[in-house]
């Protein structure tokens, strides 16, 4: 499928969709470098009564095992110019250290939800 309901109304839904594409073997991601999106004062969510904002960053890390920032940095390389289809990330010391921090966050989140 496309966008997941668990990220509605859109917090971290784009990285989640990109992760689905990555897992299907898609390696061409253009237009994800530094860009700005204007939401015009949250007109979509502001009108809803009893609106509850989702915690997309937490949902993403529980679903995929690492943060959306980690995915964008090591997989999508969102700070780099597009040259060719992406390859698997370089799994160096920085990669494993950041992945370790993501795993610690998951453990912390599990601990908090059991209280």
Where are these regions (language model features)?
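C-terminal, non-catalytic tails of nucleotide-sugar-dependent glycosyltransferases
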Residues: 28-29, 43-115
